[in-house]
From Swiss-Prot:
It comes from Paracoccus denitrificans (strain Pd 1222). NCBIfam families: DUF167 family protein. InterPro entries: DUF167 (IPR003746), YggU-like_sf (IPR036591). Belongs to the UPF0235 family. This is UPF0235 protein Pden_2174. Gene3D superfamilies: YggU-like (3.30.1200.10). HAMAP family: UPF0235.
Length: 82
């Protein structure tokens, strides 16, 4: 698991690129970009819930502190840490 704890400050906005239906769950730091792959399907918010869980673990914050600002139905998402 990629450690992103250095990004976990209140008010920080984190852009991620999501790949649903992947072969495994992972958070990948690719240069400046953060990519999250999840095995779940993008139906009824299941993939978003999996992304929040993985991203919160990588950031070392509670899931409740992550707020999806933009991209609920898109692959490019923007999260804010409260």
């Amino acid at each position: 698991m990629t450690d992103l704890s250095h990004l976990a400050r209140p008010g920080a906005e984190i852009a991620v690129r999501v790949t649903p239906r992947a072969s495994r769950n992972a958070v990948i730091l690719d240069g400046e970009a953060i990519r999250v792959t999840v095995t779940t399907v993008p139906e009824d918010g299941k993939a978003n819930a999996a992304v929040v869980k993985l991203l919160a673990k990588a950031l070392g914050v509670a899931k409740s502190r992550l707020v999806l600002v933009r991209g609920a139905t898109a692959r490019d998402k923007l999260f804010r840490i409260d």
